Structure formats: structure tokens, C-alpha cells
């Protein structure tokens, strides 16, 4: 089993067949809808809120609303659908969440997407929730995770998941690997590679994305969609407190299993950090799309599929070559 991560890999260019990168198509079909980019903001409180969810849906980007305002989920679905927008929500696996799914069916409030969102998704509780959703609201596109093994992907798919989310603790504000000794931190791209070979349905790569080039690498190794946390945090539109430190503006960014999200110091597997303010989210999305178009042109194609076929080399932590401060 080859073990590598994002910084260990460079993709090998092919002959370019376009006159301009603007000819390259970054759209992706994911479930019942098509989206401008194969990228989704992490369903975290410091990355996604209702205002941003609305903006993403209006502009043909995929989003997943976090699950930390449980009472607000049904009103959120109704509001989005009244505006002619798709609804994409998260659920956990506690007993009350099974009742919540039944209430969606009873009230005929059916979101287009539901993400079952727990840290260790290869579990009986997630399998039971997948089956529960498919029994009561079978038309919903169900994303389940997170897993880090081919066995996990297969079991969730066999239970009825329409997509699986791969990544155990590789994110910047996740400390699972330190607290538990388990995870895909440091070999997330390799884990994605192995999981995608077992998958029959789409995979979301979740965690460890530090640069726009990592998005192209995720697609090369089997992702249909790439979940991004820290790169989407700390924008003008982002949730979270803004602070000034040494004359620079920063925004808070914390993990979904941190004490700042939980409100208590118990079973903590996340931390809080401050990320330098990045300006407009629209500008970041535009740059992300342009960089991905460039990636497609280097791959020798016109769409995302060309990225899946390119060769790669393993270069062991040398891609930055002194060009980038790795503390960023």
C-alpha cells in the first residue's frame, strides 16, 4: 500500500488542447443537481450559516448546512424551497435524530440532500440512520461519513448511502489523530485513493486541503466533491468573530468537536484557531475556479474527467521548494 499525502504528490502534465483555460469546464453532477465547482464548504459553524447557504444555492454551488441548530432545520428547508433553492442539511445519529427524520416525512418537508455527519462514520449507528432515511424519505440523496477505509465505504454504500465522505481527522482544527492515535492525517490522499477504488458511488474528500492544487489532486485520486474548511473560513461573509491582532484582522475558526462548538470540555477532538482575514468569498471562489481550469488545461483535457487520468510522481514533501510558508 503506497502511503502519501497532498504535499508528496505532483501531477504530470499532458499536452494542452485548449487555447485558454477559460474553455475548461469545472462543473460537476452530484446527485440530482449540477454545480459550478466540485467543492463544498465544510458544514461547520465558522464556515457555513443560513445566509451563506442561500448565496451558495443561488449561485449554483453545493453546500451542506451544519447540524448545530437542530430546531432551525425544518424552517430552513421550508425557507430554501419557498425561494426555489435546494435544501441540504446535516443530521447526527442520536435517538432524537431518528424522530427528526420521521417528522420530515410526516410534514412532507423533504430536503434534496441529507448528510449524516459524525467523526467515526463506519458504525452501526450510521448504517441504521442511512436505512431509516431511505425507509421514510427514499428520494433524498444521502451522504454518509466520515470513513477512512474501503470497508467503511462499502458498508455505507451497501446500507443505501448515495455518497460517502472520506477523512478521519486530517483537517487543520481537528486533533483526532493526536487525542486518539487514529485517523487519516498525514495520509489522507492515500486513504482517498484506496477508498475510491472500492467505491461504486461518489466520494467527498474531507480534510487536509491546504491549496487549490489539492482540489485537483483529490479529483485525480477519486473524489467527486472536495470538502474545504480552512480555505473557506475567515472571509468577510464567514460566520465567526473578527479580532485584530498586531494590526492584522483575523477570524475565529474551530472544529465541530471542539469545546467552543460543544460548549463544554468533554470528548474534545477539535481546537480553535484564528485565520487571517481573506476578504471576499466571491474572489476566493473565482480564483479557485480559475486555478482548477488551469489544472484541467495541464491535464490535457477540457473537463474534470481529464484530471482522473493523469500520471503522478511522489516527491516527499518537496513541492513547496521554499516557495511557501508551511505555517500558513
From Swiss-Prot:
User: A Gene Ontology molecular-function term?
Assistant: GMP reductase activity
Instruction: Report the EC code(s) recorded for this entry.
Output: 1.7.1.7
Question: Where does this protein hold NADP(+)?
Answer: 203-226
Could you give one GO CC term from the UniProt record?
cytosol
Catalytic activity annotation: IMP + NH4(+) + NADP(+) = GMP + NADPH + 2 H(+)
What Gene Ontology terms for biological process does this UniProt record contain? purine nucleotide metabolic process
Name used for this protein in its record: GMP reductase
NADP in keyword set: yes
- Give, as one word, the top-level EC class: oxidoreductase
Q: Which UniProt keywords apply?
A: NADP, Oxidoreductase
Q: Which PROSITE patterns match?
A: IMP_DH_GMP_RED
User: What Pfam families does the annotation carry?
Assistant: IMPDH (PF00478)
Amino acid at each position: 500500500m503506497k502511503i502519501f499525502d497532498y504535499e508528496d504528490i505532483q501531477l504530470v502534465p499532458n499536452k494542452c488542447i485548449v487555447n485558454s483555460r477559460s474553455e475548461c469546464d469545472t462543473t460537476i453532477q452530484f446527485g440530482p443537481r449540477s454545480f459550478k465547482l466540485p467543492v463544498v464548504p465544510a458544514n461547520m459553524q465558522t464556515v457555513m450559516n443560513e445566509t451563506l447557504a442561500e448565496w451558495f444555492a443561488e449561485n449554483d454551488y453545493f453546500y451542506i448546512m451544519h447540524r448545530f441548530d437542530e430546531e432551525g432545520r425544518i424552517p430552513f428547508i421550508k425557507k430554501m424551497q419557498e425561494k426555489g433553492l435546494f435544501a441540504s442539511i446535516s443530521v447526527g445519529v442520536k435517538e432524537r435524530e431518528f424522530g427528526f427524520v420521521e417528522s420530515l416525512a410526516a410534514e412532507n418537508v423533504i430536503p434534496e440532500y441529507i448528510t449524516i455527519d459524525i467523526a467515526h462514520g463506519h458504525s452501526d449507528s450510521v448504517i441504521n440512520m442511512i436505512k431509516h432515511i431511505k425507509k421514510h424519505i427514499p428520494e433524498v440523496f444521502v451522504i454518509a461519513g466520515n470513513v477512512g477505509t474501503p470497508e467503511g465505504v462499502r458498508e455505507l454504500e451497501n446500507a443505501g448511502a448515495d455518497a460517502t465522505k472520506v477523512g478521519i481527522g486530517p483537517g487543520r482544527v481537528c486533533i483526532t489523530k493526536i487525542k486518539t492515535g487514529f485517523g487519516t492525517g498525514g495520509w489522507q490522499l492515500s486513504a482517498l485513493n484506496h477508498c475510491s477504488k472500492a467505491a461504486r458511488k461518489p466520494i467527498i474528500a474531507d480534510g487536509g486541503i491546504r491549496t487549490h492544487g489539492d482540489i485537483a489532486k483529490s479529483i485525480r485520486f477519486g473524489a467527486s466533491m472536495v470538502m474545504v474548511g480552512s480555505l473557506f473560513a475567515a472571509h468577510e461573509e464567514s460566520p465567526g468573530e473578527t479580532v485584530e491582532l498586531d494590526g492584522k484582522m483575523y477570524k475565529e475558526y474551530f472544529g465541530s468537536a471542539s469545546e467552543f462548538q460543544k460548549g463544554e470540555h468533554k470528548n474534545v477532538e477539535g481546537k480553535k484557531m484564528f485565520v487571517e482575514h481573506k476578504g471576499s468569498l466571491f474572489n476566493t471562489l473565482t480564483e479557485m475556479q480559475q486555478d482548477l481550469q488551469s489544472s484541467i488545461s495541464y491535464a490535457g483535457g477540457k473537463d474534470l474527467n481529464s484530471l482522473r487520468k493523469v500520471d503522478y510522481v511522489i516527491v516527499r514533501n518537496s513541492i513547496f521548494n521554499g516557495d511557501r510558508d508551511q505555517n500558513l
